[in-house]
Amino acid sequence: MTKHYLNSKYQSEQRSSAMKKITMGTASIILGSLVYIGADSQQVNAATEATNATNNQSTQVSQATSQPINFQVQKDGSSEKSHMDDYMQHPGKVIKQNNKYYFQAVLNNASFWKEYKFYNANNQELATTVVNDDKKADTRTINVAVEPGYKSLTTKVHIVVPQINYNHRYTTHLEFEKAIPTLADAAKPNNVKPVQPKPAQPKTPTEQTKPVQPKVEKVKPAVTAPSKNENRQTTKVVSSEATKDQSQTQSARTVKTTQTAQDQNKVQTPVKDVATAKSESNNQAVSDNKSQQTNKVTKQNEVHKQGPSKDSKAKELPKTGLTSVDNFISTVAFATLALLGSLSLLLFKRKESK
């Protein structure tokens, strides 16, 4: 007899059980991942909603103006301080928002305040709204609609303190230190588009001034003519002596002409040196001006590329919903792939079992 572990039926059963375990494990992993991703997406949505709420509150507060004001709660019909004054934080605030005035006060032990109403001098009830209700600190912030010029408010409250079995209704009057003042409107940010600086066009360099070449007057050699007195001499000279005199005068003339030519060359050389030096200095000045202008143009172009400052951009609210949609799509795709794989494995098992 063959052993049980060599039997084909036993092997197929073992394979099917192993495949069942694998499919159950993959299914549990998929379900766990879906639960985790769903919780993560909920946390992300909650965080984005919180940031949106804080941004909206900041914009609302920025549009309102406020000013602190002192007050005292006194007993009805007298100027004596009431116990109710100890259950309110000092000082209060006068707030102007959307062209409406509010007196803002913070109530301590808010759980004791079962009812509170405020009236003006004409015994007209004023609208009250709860701005913030902090259960942990047991405080409550309220806004009472007022008008500029109010000096006092009449209050009717219902206080219940269960620890001491205190349950009482009474009337007081709230006296301001000064009348409700008028407040200026909050300065709204002007959405002014930043002016983009135009790139400065480089100025065309001025035409190079040609160096003025000084005019050099040619010095003519002075030729000494023989004096008339020599011609007037009546003495006769021998022809040999006359020829000697003529040779001497010609040599003197040649010496004088060579000296004048040398002097002229000496005068012309320093003049040329001065002219060349001036032309070189002018050329250097023009090249320096060109380099400075090109540097200015490049700097202005870099500033223009950088664009306007970030301080003029308004605060943008974070984009909500995109991350949750992406997570949902990815999870659905992953789940469908896992299901298709498990179905294919089951079909394969059934074929083998047949």
UniProtKB/Swiss-Prot annotation:
Practical applications according to UniProt: Vaccination with IsdA may prevent S.aureus nasal carriage and reduce the prevalence of human disease. A combined vaccine containing IsdA, IsdB, SdrD and SdrE afforded significant protection in mice against a lethal challenge with S.aureus Newman or any of the clinical isolates NRS252, N315, NRS248, USA100 and USA400. The immune response elicited by the combined vaccine is greater than the one elicited by its individual components.
Domain NEAT: from-to ranges: 62-184
Positions that bind heme: K75, S82, Y166
Renumbered ranges of motif LPXTG sorting signal: 317-321
Pfam families reported in the protein's UniProt record: Gram_pos_anchor, NEAT
Residues bearing the modification Pentaglycyl murein peptidoglycan amidated threonine: T320
Induction per the UniProt record: Repressed by fur in the presence of iron.
Heme keyword on record: yes
Tree of life domain: Bacteria
Keywords for the protein's UniProt record, in alphabetical order: Cell wall, Heme, Iron, Metal-binding, Peptidoglycan-anchor, Secreted, Signal
InterPro entries named among the record's database cross-references: IsdA, LPXTG_anchor, NEAT_dom, NEAT_dom_sf
Residue ranges the record assigns to the propeptide: 321-354
Residue ranges, compositional bias (Basic and acidic residues): 299-318
Polar residues compositional bias, start-end: 226-268, 278-298
Xref: CDD domains: NEAT (cd06920)
Cell compartment(s), UniProt: Secreted, Cell wall
Gene3D superfamilies, per the entry: 2.60.40.1850
Keyword Heme among record annotations: yes
NCBIfam families, per database record: LPXTG_anchor
Biological role stated in the UniProt entry: Cell wall-anchored surface receptor that participates in the extraction of heme from oxidized methemoglobin/metHb to enable growth on hemoglobin as a sole iron source. Receives heme from IsdB and transfers it to IsdC. Also plays a role in the inhibition of host immune response. Protects S.aureus against the bactericidal protease activity of apolactoferrin. Decreases bacterial cellular hydrophobicity, which renders S.aureus resistant to bactericidal human skin fatty acids as well as to beta-defensins and cathelicidin.
Similarity comment: Belongs to the IsdA family.
Subunit structure: Monomer. Interacts with IsdC. Interacts with IsdB.
Entry's free-text remark on domains: The NEAT domain is responsible for binding Fe(3+) and Fe(2+) heme and fibrinogen. The NEAT domain is an inhibitor of apolactoferrin activity, while the C-domain confers resistance to bovine lactoferricin.
UniProt-listed PANTHER family: IRON-REGULATED SURFACE DETERMINANT PROTEIN C
Note from the entry: Expressed in vivo during infection or colonization by S.aureus.
Name listed for the protein in its UniProt record: Iron-regulated surface determinant protein A
Name of the encoding gene: isdA
